[in-house]
Each structure stands twice: as structure tokens, then as C-alpha cells.
A protein has these predicted regions:
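A late C-terminal transmembrane helix in Major Facilitator Superfamily
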Residues: 338-367
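Intracellular juxtamembrane helix-capping segments at the cytosolic ends
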Residues: 129-142, 321-335
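Cytoplasmic helix-loop-helix junction between adjacent transmembrane helices
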Residues: 121-156
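C-terminal membrane-cytosol helix-exit motif in multi-pass small-molecule transporters
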Residues: 170, 184-204, 388-392
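C-terminal transmembrane helical hairpin of 12-TM major facilitator-type secondary transporters
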Residues: 282-325
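Structural signature of the two symmetry-related core transmembrane helices
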Residues: 91-105, 184, 283-297, 379
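Helix-to-loop junctions at the C-terminal end of transmembrane segments
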Residues: 76-88, 173, 268-280, 366-367
Length: 397
């Protein structure tokens, strides 16, 4: 849910003359920082949703809370170049990370609904800064021959942290104070790796003059893939635990369902990428769309069999995330240079917009048809995508 593709990086002596050992140390440090931050983010979402649910808030209200963070990310993105030029790479990382952990630590203190809206919005602003700079840093030190593997590992680390977050919540429990402190401390831990590699921080030139006009007409199917992935991703983070509760599962099991869903994101990306390389990326998108249609149906029908339902969640989660990763690879095949930057910018904007729209839509769907509205909406969104890409033809984008 980030704007890494919007970033053009000017390699400097700091980024381009690193030794192999320095490059490896920097990459490991970035992965470690992203991992701890991701755990906090992924654990906080179901924690807040379950807390609001327990306090009697509607699913629509919970969905709105989930939507304000991406709004903060989108709004801060144009200002990141100015902030980095004034403060520098490392200082901006520290400012944004400290701001994020403070916002999380304040959640149990200022705990009215409107206060949470404000805190989550500001957290999105700070978190967006950290995310953009982290991925810029990663790109600036990645060699061309290793870039795909480096960014693939980054995605796997992120997905793994998203799986660990909800599981950690089941270990510490849903409470009024300590869970928030644990997740705030994890954000603080993410600063340690950056501090260790501070002297190797690159000077980043982040372009903010992107042109994305005409991209929608050129690649509607790929943008639709980003929209569906973002909608399902954020909606499941916000509501899958609540869906589990309303289907009769205990709270711990309901939270772990989310970990199973995200675990599919981690494990299945390389096999699906291999399939796309050996066959056709567009065909794989169609197949993933079909899984997206029938996955929610299967989860609902198998709700009485925890293991069977978990297997469907696992495969469904992997295929939904593959809509993003396979489409992103297809962008690289079709667009180059400045055109690629514009295409990826549109792609990321589509993903973030769906992050904003998805949770409120999912919450409203649950209110209309409790508890099956969530799965019905997820299936319907995948159906629309599959019809679109099929209508345009497997060999077109």
C-alpha cells in the first residue's frame, strides 16, 4: 500500500559505491525494520476492529476507521520530496517512525471514536513517509541484476509480518492498554536497524512531477487488479476476525483466520510467479480472479470445518495478493523509463483508493446481510474483475 513506484531515485556515491558487504548489511537492516513495523500495523488493525466491535460500534463505523490511514498515505506522498530535501533521509525516517509510535501509544489514552479517527489519519501520514523512504532506500542500493529478487524478498518479508501481527495479538490478547504499547514498542524497534546503517544512508532524489494521464485507458485491467487486491486486502484485515466471531468461532480462532489468509500471501507468490513466467501473466490473472470468486463462497460453505476453511483461505489469500504482484510485473514488461513511473503511480493510487473504499463498503455489506455480506462483496468484486479482463482478452492489458 505504498508509493514506491512513484519514486525516481538518483544514485549517489552513498548508494552506488557500497561494498557487497555493506549492501547486504543495509538490505538485512531494511528487511528487519520493515518486518517489525509490519507486525505492528497488521496486529493493530484487528485489535482496533475487535475493540470497536466490543464497544457496540457498527461495522460501517469500523470500516471508516480502517479507511482513514490510506487517506493519510495518499495526502502525504506529494510532500515527501520536500521533507526529505530539508531533513535528509535518516532524519525523516526517525521523525516519521517516532510520530507513528506516538500515535499508536496515544490510542488507549484518547479512545473516543473521533479521537481514533484523527490519530489513525495522522499515523497514516507518518507511516506513509516511512514506507516511501524505506522503499526508496531499498531501490537505491539494489543492483540491477538482483533488483527483482531483492524486491521480491521485501514483499515476502512484508507479507510475513502481516501474518505474524494477528497471531501476536492472540498471544497478548485484546486489552485496553498493553496491546497498544506492545505495537508501539515494535515501531520503536524498527528504528534500531536504520540507526545501525545510518552512515550508509543514500541521498534520495524523489521526483514529484509524475504524469499519469491516459494510464487508465491504456491498462484498465491491471488497474482493476490493483483495485480488487486492495479492496479485499484491507477489508479482510478489518473484518475477517469479526466475521469469524459472528460465524461462531472464539476470538482467538477468529484472529488466527487472518494469519492463515495472509500466510497464503507469503507462501504462494513464488509458485504463482513461476506459473506466470511459464505460461502467460494475463492468463494467471484470470485464474486468480476465478479463485477470488469462489474462494469466499468456499470459505462460507466450509465454515463448519475449520481445517478445510483454512485451506481455502490460504489459497484465496495467495491468489488475491498475486493480482498485485503479477500485474506489477506486467507493468515492467510493457512500460519503461518515465512511462513506467507514471503507470506504477496510477497502479499504486488505484490500490490506495480501494484501501479507502473497501472497509466502509465491506462494513455496509455486513450490515445489509449479516454475516455473509463480507464474503459476498469479496466474491462480487473478483467477478467484476474477471469479467473485465476476460472481455478484453487474455493477451491484452
Amino acid at each position: 500500500m505504498t508509493t514506491k513506484a512513484e519514486i525516481e531515485i538518483e544514485q549517489t556515491a552513498t548508494g552506488s559505491t557500497l561494498t557487497s558487504r555493506q549492501r547486504t548489511i543495509s538490505l538485512v537492516a531494511i528487511y528487519a525494520a520493515v518486518f517489525t513495523w509490519g507486525i505492528s500495523y497488521a496486529g493493530l488493525m484487528p485489535l482496533m476492529a475487535l475493540t470497536l466491535e466490543g464497544n457496540g460500534y457498527s461495522t460501517l463505523s469500523i470500516g471508516i476507521i480502517g479507511a482513514v490511514t490510506p487517506i493519510g498515505v495518499i495526502l502525504v506522498a506529494p510532500f515527501v520530496p520536500f521533507i526529505v530535501s530539508r531533513l535528509g533521509t535518516l532524519n525523516t525516517i526517525f521523525l516519521s517512525s517516532v510520530g507513528s509510535l506516538v500515535m499508536v501509544a496515544l490510542l488507549p489514552i484518547f479512545n473516543t471514536y473521533n479521537e481514533w479517527l484523527a490519530l489513525r489519519f495522522v499515523a497514516g501520514v507518518f507511516g506513509g513517509m516511512s514506507w516511501i523512504i524505506s522503499e526508496s532506500w531499498l531501490n537505491s542500493i539494489a543492483s540491477e541484476k538482483m533488483r527483482n529478487r531483492i524486491t521480491a524478498m521485501y514483499g515476502a518479508v512484508m507479507a510475513t509480518s502481516f501474518a505474524v501481527g494477528p497471531f501476536m495479538l492472540t498471544m497478548i490478547g485484546v486489552g485496553d492498554f498493553w496491546p497498544y504499547m506492545v505495537f508501539a514498542i515494535l515501531i520503536a524497534f524498527s528504528l534500531i536497524p536504520f540507526a545501525l546503517i545510518g552512515k550508509m544512508a543514500p541521498v534520495l532524489n524523489l521526483a514529484n512531477d509524475m504524469k499519469i494521464s491516459g494510464i487508465l485507458i491504456a491498462m484498465p485491467s491491471l488497474l482493476a487488479a490493483a483495485l480488487v487486491c486492495g479492496m479485499v486486502d484491507m477489508s479482510m484485515f478489518s473484518f475477517l476476525p469479526i466475521w469469524g466471531l459472528r460465524m461462531g468461532y472464539e476470538q482467538e480462532i477468529s484472529i488466527q483466520l487472518l494469519s492463515v489468509f495472509v500466510l497464503g500471501n507469503v507462501v504462494l507468490q513464488l509458485p504463482i510467479a513461476w506459473l506466470a513466467e511459464k505460461t502467460n501473466g494475463r492468463l494467471v490473472l484470470v485464474l486468480c480472479g476465478i479463485v477470488g470468486i469462489f474462494g469466499p463462497i468456499g470459505v462460507t460453505l466450509m465454515a463448519d470445518n475449520l481445517y478445510a476453511m483454512g485451506a481455502v483461505l490460504f489459497v484465496w489469500g495467495g491468489c488475491i495478493w498475486a493480482l498485485y504482484t503479477v500485474s506489477l510485473a506486467m507493468l515492467g514488461e510493457r512500460f519503461k523509463g518515465g512511462s513506467l513511473t507514471a503507470a506504477c503511480a496510477a497502479f499504486v493510487v488505484a490500490y490506495e483508493i480501494s484501501n479507502i473504499v473497501g472497509p466502509p463498503a465491506a462494513g455496509y455489506a455486513i450490515e445489509l446481510w449479516e454475516p455473509h455480506g463480507l464474503m459476498a462483496l469479496m466474491s462480487a468484486s473478483a467477478l467484476l474483475f474477471t469479467v473485465l479482463i476476460s472481455a478484453r482478452g487474455i493477451y491484452r492489458t
